[in-house]
Amino acid sequence: MWLQILFLVLSVGRIDAAPPGQSRVVGGYKCEKNSQPWQVAVINRYLCGGVLIDPSWVITAAHCYSHNYHVLLGRNNLFKDEPFAQYRVVNQSFPHPDYNPFFMKNHTLFPGDDHSNDLMLLHLSEPADITDGVKVIDLPTEEPKVGSTCLASGWSSTKPLEWEFPDDLQCVNINILSNEKCIKAHTQMVTDVMLCAGELEGGKDTCNGDSGGPLLCDGVLQGITSWSSVPCGETNRPAIYTKLIKFTSWIKEVMKENS
């Protein structure tokens, strides 16, 4: 059943809620098998990434909002039979209340736009089975540091402005930069609930289809992919990630009230 859903999504154009999620892994590499067991593929009209933070809860980007979701867990390759693969239906979604709902339908970036609070919680109809290939990851407890080495992951296009999508999960190594770097790089708002990450020399980035996926810095989940420039991976155009340390209280409150 889930393979039919996935093929349908790909047949109509495997795109994410573009540009706020201009998030594809560019300049990356094939992730080591089962090295990202919290990675989730969120399937609706688009393909987005997500992160398993509790057996019953996935966090993703608010601009990935839709009315029906399915999630794939424990997958390295989206199309091959894999021993740890699981499929779940989402029965409730909780976009952050301060995210601008206009951007849930309109995904074009304009100068001055403020995409703050770009995160959403998805409640699974049945908890995930925790195995060697499916694991939860803890929320951050400390601020990420500028210069931290980070890893982002996803299944989306590996070349800027081209629809070349890998079957296998891709990883890319980038660094946390000061928000001032992103303020200079973008005409959109860069706020204190966002993280700036990438490589100023370009060539490494997240892009179309990775939105909502994890950003791990020094092994700690610190962000989820939000938006970047078009095309991605350009020189002096680092990407923007939702800064999770700013939202841990809200996340825990939603999970507690709706479990």
Swiss-Prot record:
Q: Which reaction does it catalyse?
A: Preferential cleavage of Arg-|-Xaa bonds in small molecule substrates. Highly selective action to release kallidin (lysyl-bradykinin) from kininogen involves hydrolysis of Met-|-Xaa or Leu-|-Xaa
List the GO cellular component terms.
extracellular space; secretory granule
The signal peptide here is 1-18
According to the UniProt entry, what is the EC number of this protein? 3.4.21.35
Disulfide bonding pattern of the chain: 31-171, 48-64, 150-217, 182-196, 207-232
Q: Which InterPro entries match?
A: Peptidase_S1_PA (IPR009003), Peptidase_S1_PA_chymotrypsin (IPR043504), Peptidase_S1A (IPR001314), Trypsin_dom (IPR001254), TRYPSIN_HIS (IPR018114), TRYPSIN_SER (IPR033116)
Please give the tissue specificity annotation from the record for this chain: Kidney and submandibular gland.
Stored Gene3D superfamilies: Trypsin-like serine proteases
GO BP term (any one):
regulation of systemic arterial blood pressure
Q: Does the keyword Lipoprotein apply?
A: no
- Top-rank taxon: Eukaryota
Q: Which residues are glycosylated?
A: 91, 106
Q: Does the keyword DNA-binding apply?
A: no
Record key words, sorted: Disulfide bond, Glycoprotein, Hydrolase, Protease, Serine protease, Signal, Zymogen
Q: Any chance you could tell me the propeptide residue ranges?
A: 19-24
One Pfam match = Trypsin
Any one Gene Ontology MF annotation carried by this entry is: serine-type endopeptidase activity
Query: Which purpose does this protein serve, as stated in its record?
Result: Glandular kallikreins cleave Met-Lys and Arg-Ser bonds in kininogen to release Lys-bradykinin.
User: What is the protein's name according to its record?
Assistant: Glandular kallikrein-12, submandibular/renal
Source organism of the structure: Rattus norvegicus (Rat)
